[in-house]
Amino acid sequence: MTENHDAIVTDAKSEGSGGCPVAHDRALHPTQGGGNRQWWPERLNLKILAKNPAVANPLDEDFDYAEAFKALDLAAVKRDIAEVLTTSQDWWPADFGNYGPLMIRMAWHSAGTYRISDGRGGAGAGQQRFAPLNSWPDNGNLDKARRLLWPVKKKYGQSISWADLLILTGNVALETMGFKTFGFGGGRADVWEAEEDVYWGPETTWLDDRRYTGDRELENPLGAVQMGLIYVNPEGPNGNPDPIAAARDIRETFRRMAMNDEETVALIAGGHTFGKTHGAGPADHVGADPEAASLEEQGLGWRSTYGTGKGADAITSGLEVTWTSTPTQWSNGFFKNLFEYEYELEQSPAGAHQWVAKNAPEIIPDAHDPSKKHRPRMLTTDLSLRFDPIYEPISRRFYENPEEFADAFARAWYKLTHRDMGPKSLYLGPEVPEETLLWQDPLPEREGELIDDADIAILKTKLLESGLSVSQLVTTAWASASTFRASDKRGGANGARIRLAPQRGWEVNDPDQLAQVLRTLENVQQEFNASSGAKKVSLADLIVLGGAAGVEKAAKEAGFEIQVPFTPGRVDATEEHTDVESFEALEPTADGFRNYLGKGNRLPAEYLLLDKANLLNLSAPEMTVLVGGLRVLGANHQQSQLGVFTKTPGVLTNDFFVNLLDMGTTWKATSEDQTTFEGRDAATGEVKWAGSRADLVFGSNSELRALAEVYASDDAKEKFVKDFVAAWHKVMDADRFDLV
């Protein structure tokens, strides 16, 4: 985190800044974007359910990145990276003759967009190459870091993704400057388009702040204090140089990135052991960001007219701070300078608030002139580590115990750069550590032999004879599996964590009913395992199998014999290996598939349904067929009748779509906030149905209505069942990485 923010561009709508995508004074050509979203900016954007399509991928259909990475000589790649780090280029000279600190910042900012609330952001897809991240003020001049790495990427081609290369380079930078890293796991496959499914904030101006309410309460799911920053403003909240106030921002933003206080101190101090910030002159010398720069800049941005515009004249954050006397060598120098000097406020050459050591010797080297020395300097957010009553004792302990600090930084850096990769089983390469960490949501080894087809048939019968209804079986399986997030590959049915805190107490899961269902399922499990010899069934498998049995029964009653695919092999997680606080972030505040809408949601239910479908990696047709099927199967929260547009609940029919599209029904809101509606017979006025926004949207939105019409057609009854089963199976197996 060696360069914290950028004071260059202040208006995302200004000419040349690549800001607001809507041209308010004219219609856009289709090649410019806009289109329907310009005319109706609040319409549902179903394109987020079709991201990274195969047609956008230039690689061969049979290309397997994991296999390509496994064949890579990682040591050779690291040697080539190391050579880049100490080979200064005239077009962007290296500070202190070493690009290592720049590359640490690049890797940090690639990973540091991750947030726990929805699992989005992070380094997993190499999104730093694309807008908006490539042009965020906080990522100023990281375009040069990536361009410096092009010779390495060019040499190894598709054997190493940009996503992996950015993080690996951060590790190599640390290692070549004397630090022992905790490890590295590859496996981050690149994508080929910018993400449109991440909400970065409500602001339309760089570095604006409209994301707080009340007593500085940061809007969910955001993880930064201002638009275009990774975490906090290094000058202090909204530029106010108050270390105590800044500490509050630091604690909240780092918490939202899954870091505790000790990890936060280690990361800030460790990152600021290296390199410097850049604020040689006024920000008005700096040009457009990469996305807005002219064609001839070839993807580079922030061209500066201040002096040479580079090296000693570089401007990025507007701050001019070097923290230690050995900025290209691992040391405890950050804490030494933090505690051994008193600091007074000053302004950088660019006019930014920073702190300089009082009456201190000039012990800090100049980045480009070996004859010059400087006094130690700190950012407002650095001083937070000394003056905040929680951070201070941690910082002092690290100062007095350098080995403990080094271990804490190594582990925190590893967590930072791998948090969004999912389970450890997905990590690739020879440098993956043996140690499994709690934040990786570990699962135990499977006990006993797998059940076979005969056992599966027996268990299905027992489940259907257990007294549990189709609704209960289906709802429990959905509640377990639908915790999965494709964003950071957390959650899912494997582990059966639905039986553990915090999931067993989540409001969306109807805790009382869930407890009853789990008791029954555990009885079936225990009875089977006691009489099955070496073969054992996990509760995780049994929950999913119960859902399959329920769906098959409902389909049969609709007149269709179908088998729901089921592959055993899930295991049951333990409380010891479940971080309750970490899993609290996965609690749904809404689940349109169960017609659940919790309190305090900013967006209407239909938007939240789309967001949930996106996190489950569903397409628009899959979302549509699942909603229609779950409604008639009675899978609603608290057995609500909202959206149950059928006279035969528990039977897998296409009634939801047939009755929603019936022109003999008129709809009217029944709540002031227009969250619930009733459908009346147009002729008699009799109330026929009740629905939510997550139901009526399938008749209201033109694209979703087109999908609903497919499933409402007379010839679609069997197709509906088959498509529902396929989409259901996809969700149930979303976290079965062992099957890929």
From Swiss-Prot:
Covalent link Tryptophyl-tyrosyl-methioninium (Trp-Tyr) (with M-257), residues: 108-231
EC annotation from Swiss-Prot or TrEMBL: 1.11.1.21
PROSITE patterns, A to Z: PEROXIDASE_1, PEROXIDASE_2, PEROXIDASE_4
Highest rank taxon of the organism: Bacteria
Amino acid composition bias (Basic and acidic residues), ranges on this chain: 1-14
Catalytic site: 109
CDD domains: catalase_peroxidase_1, catalase_peroxidase_2
Cofactor(s) annotated in UniProt: heme b
Binding sites annotated in the UniProt record for heme b: 272
PTM section of the record: Formation of the three residue Trp-Tyr-Met cross-link is important for the catalase, but not the peroxidase activity of the enzyme.
Cellular component terms per the entry's GO annotation: cytosol
Entry keyword set: Heme, Hydrogen peroxide, Iron, Metal-binding, Oxidoreductase, Peroxidase
Cross-link Tryptophyl-tyrosyl-methioninium (Tyr-Met) (with W-108) residue location(s): 231-257
Catalytic activity annotation: H2O2 + AH2 = A + 2 H2O; 2 H2O2 = O2 + 2 H2O
Role summary: Bifunctional enzyme with both catalase and broad-spectrum peroxidase activity.
PANTHER family listed in its UniProt record: CATALASE-PEROXIDASE (PTHR30555:SF0), HYDROPEROXIDASE I, BIFUNCTIONAL CATALASE-PEROXIDASE (PTHR30555)
The protein, known as: Catalase-peroxidase
Organism in which the protein naturally occurs: Streptomyces reticuli
Top-level taxonomy: Bacteria, Bacillati, Actinomycetota, Actinomycetes, Kitasatosporales
